[in-house]
Amino acid sequence: MPGKLLSSRCLTFVAGLAGALLARSAVTAQEVSPAAAKFLGAAGCASAMCHGGAGERRGQHAIWSKLDFHTRAHATLTSTRSQRFADTLKLGNPAESARCTVCHHPFQSVPAEKKAATVGQFEGVSCESCHGAAESWLRFHTRADITHADRVNAGMRDLKNLHVRAGTCVACHQNLDPDLRAAGHPELIFELDGQSVAQPKHWRETNVWSGPQAWLVGQAVALREMTWQLEREPAAKKTETDRQQALRWMLEKTSGQNAPDATLQTWSDQLARTVAGKAGSAAATRAQLAALVATSADFKNAAIPQPLQARRAERLVLGLDRLLATLKLEKKSAPSVKLDQLFKDVQSLPDFDPARFAAHLAEFEQALKELKPAQP
């Protein structure tokens, strides 16, 4: 339906929740096939013997329920601000409108026959929104003799795969319908690593370099989604085109590749798959950081319009933040102080000064070069 891009894209995501068409596992021999599995609700994950107990392996539900922003996703729709958006768009109650609940309370868009009675009325974005309908794998997924492949075959979404993880999250964290933007909905910027850290994480990463890897996969998937939307919005505002082209620029710098105009969506998705298929490493992170800090000359190019430069800088500083985090520097270290200045430079995009930013970026690059060799 024209003009309903968020709904169409995200309803595809919800449909995926309602029918994960994955192969049945011969090892687990579950009684319910993944395609027929129902959603059980967060309560099904909360027992002390599962994810509601104490300790690193059993405290996930407590972290999610007490600290994760997703638990408050539905509550956001009850605010005066949300009602103002809904009034502008004549949606009625935002807490009940599918235009809003598709991302803030996805269970509302799942057919009743796919939900067990244990599903909470106002769960927001809960366990199965990301992990998939649990009826076909809940009872056995914590058993020691069950492999990750067994769980995935039984219907659990493979969130260890960063490409799959990014695709699960991006549907509600990047694109907006034009009318929602016009009504005042906050702009969305997808940052897989940064937003995962802010949740905070209720899972363990086995690779200490997975953060930069997740960041890059997330950026590539974000470009894929932005390109998808712009192909369906021929009359998109210049702002959206600038955002897409800024992200494209950053990914070209990071990857060392030239992104083709004709196949940009395919290119960005393939980049995400390629990066997700390789283990993150110190060498890869250093190379990415070096490539991005060496872009100060780009911001001295007077032929590039200021709004596009501002959008480039906006994406760049977020990326530098995620990559610099791996160095575990003190807040008073020279690179950290210089990065703080770069963030200040992009606080007001209309007032962004490319030349000033270029100078500060060069200072940041020099501060990194002066780090002691013992530091990563």
Tell what function each PLM region has.
Residues 31, 54-88, 112-125, 133-317:
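Primarily the internal scaffold of c-type cytochrome electron-transfer domains
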Residues 93-125:
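Post-signal peptide N-terminal segment of secreted/secretory-pathway proteins
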Residues 269-376:
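Extended, amphipathic alpha-helical scaffolds
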